[in-house]
Amino acid sequence: IGTAEIYSQLEKVPEVLEGLVIGQIYDADTRIVLFVRLREGVELDTTLADRIRLTIRHGATPRHVPAVVLAVDDLPRTRSGKIAEIAVREIVHGRSVNNQSALANPEALALFENLPELA
């Protein structure tokens, strides 16, 4: 599936500043994991996570709905400002990221390491 459809639906959720989507190999399949950066003072609770999923389901398709939604404080970006999906996918799968020098904020990758929700 394309991530653009998910990102366009996130724009409809005012609490979400931006998001990052990856496919995680999980249980002999691939599941969608959505990381969101939220507005200041907003916490990701079950109600907000469910609303995010419902917004994506209605605006895209059921296949686009993330299995896991997690809040993070920062998203890694390339020096040109693009969100680094591939780098996050590698970290989540326990692999190293070789081109960290291409990232403007490589320290943000640590936010995605060894997350118990993704084990």
What are the residue ranges of the model-derived segments?
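Short, compositionally biased leader-like segments
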Residues: 24, 44-49
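Conserved C-terminal "lid"/linker of ANL adenylate-forming enzymes
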Residues: 20-25, 33-34, 53-119
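Conserved beta-loop-beta connector loops within the AMP-binding
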Residues: 15, 43-45, 84
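Short acidic amphipathic segments
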Residues: 10-19
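Adenylate-forming
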Residues: 1-11, 35-46, 60-68
